[in-house]
């Protein structure tokens, strides 16, 4: 089987897929000064899958950012032309993920440039951001793949083809399909290699607004404690490891070796995060978390009061947001426990403060007062505090994902198929109810919500750190 035959079919899919849904890059700034330019005059032979990611487009509301998009200029036919990833745009571009099967070996940067008509500097930026992945063998296509895509996948992964590739000898197909990040522009990719290119990585403009040195709580030989700002990622995303707390804190401290992530808090959450200075301490801290030697306290600003005491739910074991929780035990679902230690009435944040932190209005009916709760997190599930409080009818202020569902359940008790007033009678009714309930949730917050990791301690308090006052207190008298 010749790789070219697969290429033709996949290029056809590309032209009928992505380019029919979104603007192609039909022309771009000539890079005559680049030594790589000669490579892009050749006809592309690459096999190309293309898709638009189903993830939601998230826009930043930070008005102070330079409004420069990733696609900064426009050609005569209205299509965008790519330039550089910096300066950071104030808005994320439309999702675009490209899937390639390499037909001719060579440096990865050159191959992506000629296959996708992208400028070398832009592709180099993507690689630096961690937005390009490879696998020795093309992974299994998703259920949504077309018959033509399935056919081509079978062609390039046929045993007769794979048996001729020395790079995968001794590996199972599953092992060879594992994806790894491309780390260098000159990295060689052989024919048959699969590439995934996140052309529009998720951006974090807030990283460029923060005085990172002022957010450092402690520096030791083994770790750094950071007061993470809301609207930032602790260790980066699958398509952007550059715009992260670990990267910017490392630079602020002048470290030559980047800090390492030991645990996560949501992008929209602020507060204490421990970053390891060495791989050894990263492993040590992970062990402390597993052994439950790390204690985390949160401050949550809720729209309704929360009862003092331990709250227990069970979280659906599906790694997709929003996270659904049940009051009743369900086999296979994850136990979620938190302890509400305090709950006091406070003023609802004033409009100026809300605007400063891009707090989204999810139309909670009463905004006269809010409630500040101190919470001891007893289990550490993704979105746990947000999901549990919303399930109690006390969503977090600004939580545009979970508050709409809480409002819907409050207005029409029984919509939540896992709540007190569930109404379904059969399993088929339940499936339909779950689907409808899932649709009641909103989008992920753009910057901040009323949630702070206010304290972190371990080894029975031998190491104890506190964050600064949460954002919502800055407007209080």
Task: Enumerate the language-model features and the residues they cover.
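N-terminal chloroplast transit peptides
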Residues: 1-41
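Pseudouridine synthases involved in rRNA/tRNA modification
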Residues: 2-7, 37-42, 46-127, 136, ...
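RNA pseudouridine synthases
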Residues: 49, 54-63, 131, 184-195, ...
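A generic structural signal for ordered alpha-helices
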Residues: 90, 101, 167-173, 194, ...
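Amphipathic alpha-helical scaffolds
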Residues: 140-143
């Amino acid at each position: 089987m010749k790789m070219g035959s697969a290429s033709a079919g996949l290029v056809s899919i590309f032209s009928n897929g992505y380019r029919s849904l979104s603007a192609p890059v039909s022309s771009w700034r000539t890079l005559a000064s680049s030594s790589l330019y000669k490579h892009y005059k050749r006809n592309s032979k690459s096999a190309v899958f293309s898709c638009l990611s189903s993830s939601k487009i998230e826009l930043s509301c930070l008005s102070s950012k330079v409004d420069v998009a990733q696609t900064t200029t426009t050609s005569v036919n209205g299509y965008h032309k790519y330039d550089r990833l910096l300066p950071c745009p104030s808005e994320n571009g439309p999702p675009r993920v490209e899937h390639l099967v390499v037909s001719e070996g060579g440096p990865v940067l050159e191959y992506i440039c000629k296959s996708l008509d992208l400028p070398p500097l832009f592709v180099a930026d993507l690689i630096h951001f961690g937005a390009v992945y490879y696998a020795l063998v093309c992974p299994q296509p998703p259920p949504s793949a077309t018959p033509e895509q399935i056919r081509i996948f079978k062609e390039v992964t046929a045993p007769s083809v794979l048996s001729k590739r020395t790079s995968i000898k001794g590996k199972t197909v599953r092992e060879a399909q594992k994806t790894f990040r491309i780390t260098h522009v000159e990295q060689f990719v052989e024919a048959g290699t699969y590439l995934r290119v996140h052309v529009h990585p998720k951006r974090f403009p807030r990283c460029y607004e923060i005085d990172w040195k002022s957010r450092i709580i402690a520096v030791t030989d083994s770790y750094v404690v950071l007061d993470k700002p809301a609207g930032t990622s602790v260790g980066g995303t699958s398509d952007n490891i550059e715009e992260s707390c670990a990267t910017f804190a490392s630079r602020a401290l002048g470290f030559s070796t980047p800090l390492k992530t030991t645990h996560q808090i949501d992008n929209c959450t602020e507060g204490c995060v421990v970053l390891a200075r060495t791989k050894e301490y990263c492993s040590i801290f992970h062990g402390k978390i597993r052994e439950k030697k790390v204690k985390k306290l949160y401050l949550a600003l809720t729209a309704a009061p929360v009862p003092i005491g331990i709250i227990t739910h069970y979280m659906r074991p599906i790694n997709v947001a929003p996270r659904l929780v049940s009051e009743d035990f369900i086999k296979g679902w994850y136990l979620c426990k938190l302890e509400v230690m305090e709950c006091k009435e406070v003023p609802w944040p004033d409009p100026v403060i809300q605007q400063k932190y891009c707090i989204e209005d999810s139309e909670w009916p009463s905004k006269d007062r809010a409630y500040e709760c101190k919470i001891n997190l007893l289990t550490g599930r993704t979105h746990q505090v947000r999901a549990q409080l919303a399930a109690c009818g006390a969503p977090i202020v600004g939580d545009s994902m979970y508050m709409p569902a809480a409002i819907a359940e409050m207005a029409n008790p029984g919509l939540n198929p896992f709540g007190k007033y569930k109404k379904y009678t059969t399993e088929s009714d339940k499936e339909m109810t779950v689907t409808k309930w899932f649709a009641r949730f909103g989008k992920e917050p753009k910057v901040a919500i009323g949630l702070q990791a206010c304290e972190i301690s371990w080894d029975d308090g031998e190491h104890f750190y506190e964050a600064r006052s949460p954002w919502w207190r800055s407007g209080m008298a």
